[in-house]
C-alpha cells in the first residue's frame, strides 16, 4: 500500500418514483401545448449555472433549420420562490450576499437572472412551451414522456437529479462536458 486511500465515485441516485405512466396521452399533451414532433426538455429550477441562457439560443439555431422541433422549459425561477417576508429568507439572502462578496464575481450574481426573456427577443414563442412554476411529483412524468431528449447545458455541474430522472425515461441526454457529465453521459449510449 502506498498510504493513499481509494477514491470512490458516488453519483446522484436514480429516483424510482419518477417513471413513465402507461397509456399516457402524449399526443393530446403535445396538441394542447402546441408541441412539434421532436421535443427537447430543460427541467428543474432555473438557475444561472444550469445554462438556460445557452439552451435557448442553441435551440433557436436548430429551430431555424427545422420546423418540427419544440423546446419545453419546465421549472421555477429559483429567486422568485423566496418569500421575502420570512425570516428564513432574509437569513438566506443575507448569507448568500456575504458569500457572494467573498466568492463570486459580479457577473455570477443571478438574482436578476431572466433567460426566459431570450424567447421573445429571438421571436421563438411559438416553438417554446414555458411552465415556470413548481411541478408536483405526480406531474413530472408528463414533461419527460412528451420529450425526446433532456438538455443539461450546465456552466458547471453538480450531481443532477434531472439527469437521473431522464434515465428512468430512457431518454438521450445532451450535456456540456463539465463536472461529472463526461463520466456519466456517454456519446452514443445515453
Predicted regions and their residues:
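Nucleotide-sugar donor-binding and catalytic loop/hinge architecture
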Residues: 22-39, 63-66
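Short hydrophobic "strand-cap" motifs at the C-terminus of beta-strands
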Residues: 10-13, 42-44, 74-76, 131-132, ...
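Acidic donor-binding loop of glycosyltransferase active sites
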Residues: 142-159, 168-171
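Conserved donor-binding/catalytic core segment of Leloir-type glycosyltransferases
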Residues: 34-50, 56-59, 71-74
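Short donor-sugar binding/catalytic loops of nucleotide-sugar-dependent glycosyltransferases
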Residues: 43-47, 62, 77-79, 134, ...
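Donor nucleotide-sugar binding/catalytic pocket of nucleotide-sugar-dependent glycosyltransferases
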Residues: 1-23, 35
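Nucleotide-activated donor-binding/catalytic signature segment of Leloir-type glycosyltransferases, i.e.
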Residues: 84-138
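Short acidic/histidine- and often glycine-rich active-site loop of Leloir-type glycosyltransferases
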Residues: 165, 178-190
Amino acid at each position: 500500500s502506498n498510504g493513499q486511500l481509494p477514491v470512490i465515485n458516488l453519483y446522484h441516485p436514480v429516483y424510482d418514483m419518477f417513471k413513465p405512466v402507461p397509456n399516457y396521452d402524449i399526443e393530446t399533451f403535445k396538441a394542447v401545448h402546441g408541441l412539434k414532433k421532436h421535443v427537447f426538455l430543460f427541467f428543474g429550477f432555473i438557475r444561472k449555472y444550469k445554462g438556460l441562457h445557452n439552451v435557448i439560443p442553441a435551440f433557436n439555431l436548430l429551430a431555424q433549420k427545422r420546423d418540427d422541433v419544440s423546446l419545453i422549459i419546465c421549472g421555477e425561477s429559483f429567486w422568485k420562490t423566496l418569500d421575502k417576508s420570512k425570516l428564513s429568507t432574509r437569513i438566506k439572502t443575507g448569507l448568500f450576499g456575504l458569500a457572494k462578496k467573498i466568492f463570486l464575481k459580479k457577473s455570477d450574481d443571478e438574482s436578476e437572472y431572466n433567460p426566459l426573456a431570450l424567447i421573445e427577443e429571438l421571436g421563438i414563442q411559438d416553438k417554446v412551451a414555458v411552465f415556470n412554476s413548481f411541478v408536483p411529483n405526480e406531474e413530472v412524468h408528463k414533461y419527460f414522456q412528451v420529450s425526446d431528449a433532456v438538455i443539461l447545458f450546465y456552466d458547471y455541474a453538480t450531481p443532477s437529479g434531472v439527469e437521473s430522472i431522464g434515465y428512468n425515461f430512457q431518454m438521450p441526454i445532451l450535456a456540456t462536458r463539465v463536472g461529472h457529465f463526461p463520466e456519466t453521459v456517454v456519446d452514443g449510449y445515453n
